Amino acid sequence: MKTNQSQTAPAEVRENIMGTMEINPLLLKLSIPMMISMLVQALYNVVDSVFVSHVSESALTAVSLAFSLQNVMIAVGVGTGVGVNALLSKSLGEKNQSRANATAENGIFLSLCSFAVFFVIGLTCMKPYFYAQTSDPVIAQQGIRYLAVCCIFSLGIFTQTMGEKLLAATGRTQLSMISQLVGAVVNIILDPIFIFGYCGQALSGTTGAAVATVIGQFCGAGMTLYFNTRKNPDIQISFKGFRPSAKAIGRIYTVGLPSIAMQCVGSLMTFGMNLILMAFSATAVAVFGVYFKLQSFVFMPIFGLNNGMVPIISYNYGARRPDRVKKTIKLAVCYAEGIMLAGFCIFQFAPGQVLSIFAASDAMFAIGIPAMRIICLHFLLAGASIVLSSVFQALGNGVFSLIVSVCRQLFVLLPAAWLLAQTGNVNNVWWAFLIAEIVSVLLSLGFYARINKNIIAPMYSPAE
């Protein structure tokens, strides 16, 4: 690995693309590969659910119940990566190579620690988790087999996620996209082979879905390892004599912990919604699970857009270029709202067609079609909220994102859903999403006004 300053200087000059290239093409250059990458990531759970739905509705329900804890696992990996991404980009913008290297090394260490935690969870917590949500032993056992494999072999997803964030932080989003594609293609190929028993009954059904998923994740992780060691000269990673730095870890989690908490709040929301909907029927839970898988194809491109946006904002924040920061935010909001409008049209005008992908029963169609049409109304407001949430993180104010997320999903959505469920009509429950989104966008706009006044506007003054 490169060690002397003369070798790192050219890399720093090249990295100035985030400070000099016109914003619109730069945002598209960094975001489009990440948007594709995030769509590919959405395929992991969606493909599992599509194939599993052809096994039985109980298997589909089991995978839906597993999603809450799966999302916590993803939250830890992605949230830690968000902290690494923002701080590494900011360090490069400040020309602080040693801090950039330390951020990357400690980020990798944290991803290994995360794997150790979920390895233990996979061995000890599966039964209580599922039986807290359902009394049906068939659904519970199918879920246990699926989620235990995902947790025990989670090293792949944690190393892949961190590797992708390191590539994105240095502007190499195309390589991150390739890593995602490799993992997803492997998963798609292996899913039917395992799920339908071609590798034996012991690895069929939900167990097979999990095995295919983790193999795909390990393949993606291998690609990120190769790209970061061979194709990413702008960070020099060396674990010779490495010791975890409390200071570096603290900086990472100052930005990343709100993101982790925010996504974990989402897991609590899905867990709570499952409990509310199970009072109606297991089919209602399956419909909610299918909705969550389908909506990922709308939301994931915006998360990819944010992944391309964050390093641009962080870099120019470090370089004190407020004009570029504000233009990046405006363009990102416009693109996000365009994506959400497209998603709204699909869910509003073709809900039956998308449900049919999951071998939906008549009962699923009866609940699912009105559910899709009602829930998608909040898409029209969500784009701005999602972008502003990442803006807060990129500017070191991730706590604002956390406040918005907690208010939206715990203080508004779940209570509203519970109250609407008391009407005895499951269709009324779905209106809680629109109610919560209205609160979310109002809070986000208020916090952005504060960020603009206290952080962005002062950058127009010369640094002292």
Per-segment meaning from a language model:
Residues 81, 150-168, 176-184, 209-224, ...:
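Short runs within selected transmembrane alpha-helices of multi-pass transporters and secretion channels
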Residues 1-31, 88-155, 201-257, 313-378, ...:
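Short alpha-helical transmembrane segments in multi-pass integral membrane proteins
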Residues 39, 43-61, 130-137, 193-204, ...:
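Helix-terminus/linker motif at the lipid-water interface of multi-pass membrane proteins
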Residues 29-48, 149, 160, 183, ...:
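Transmembrane helical elements of multi-pass membrane transporters/channels
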